[in-house]
Amino acid sequence: MDVLAVDVGGTHVKILATGQDQPRKFVSGSKLTPKRMVAEARKLAGKWKYDVVSIGYPGVVTQGRPISEPHNLASGWVGFDFEKAFGVPVKVINDAAMQALGSYKKGRMLFLGLGTGLGSTMIVDGDVQPMELAHLPYKRGTYEDYVGLRGLERLGRRKWQRHVFDVVDRLSAALEPNDIVLGGGNAKKLKDLPPGCRAGNNANAFLGGFRLWGDGVEHLPGNLVPTPPSSAPEAEAEDLSPQSEKKKKQSRKKTKKTGKAKGEQTWQDA
């Protein structure tokens, strides 16, 4: 069975079919309707063969159907007949859940997708649980306001990364995952990964779409198969957690008073 996986994002829609080695994409944005999305996806797929379709949808999905309109796209998605539009059986799943499914290994995994917005999914012993944390209150806004694209553009990379570390720390304490994956297009903009995290691979969204129909990594082309992490020791990463930043500020204040940093000797101490 050949599967067409469609990853719908706030900036682009990406597609890949089993047996193909190069994803294709087109621009999405606030004017993208589901009718236009299907038309563009079918046109872009061209001569690709597919028997079924998987759609990663940027919103709440219940029993395979969107139940809320996406925040970054046009309306009309709720109640839209995707199977009629594509002409083949279709499965719809939350976009973060689709990438999480492709990233999953075992146990309790938390997936956070850092893209235009914030995707969030827990998988516990194979059970996929989309979380929809993006628009929950966080500081003076929502999680998405601080760690989504708006937060990155407004705060700058360093402060944005600090909030990513803070969000991971909070969610890790609350959910107790034994595996944390940071995916999405902006994950690669992190200078370092928070402790206990591994980097996701955007190609895992396609793998998740294939897995929805029982297909696995054997259908992901070699140039897209995620590379296992190196076993070589890594250099110690700079700690950008909120606790570390607080300690640095206290150290700087102490340095101003004494004229030296902790552990630093002056000529009077020698």
Please provide the spans of the model-predicted regions:
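Short glycine-rich, Thr/Ser-proximal phosphate-binding strand/loop in the N-terminal lobe
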Residues: 2-39, 43, 124-154
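Short glycine-aspartate micro-motif
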Residues: 3-7, 52-54, 109-113, 181
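Short beta-strand scaffold segments in enzyme catalytic cores
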Residues: 13-17, 59, 101, 118-123
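Glycine-rich phosphate-binding loop and adjoining helix at the ATP-binding site
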Residues: 29-42, 46-54, 59-108, 145-147, ...
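Proline-aspartate-enriched helix->loop->beta-strand connector
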Residues: 50, 161-181, 185
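Glycine-rich beta-strand-to-loop/alpha-helix junction loops that act as flexible
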Residues: 53-59, 116, 177-186, 200-202
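Oxyanion-binding and handling regions
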Residues: 153, 159-162, 170, 186, ...
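Intrinsically disordered, polybasic Lys/Arg-rich low-complexity tracts
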Residues: 229, 233-234, 239-267
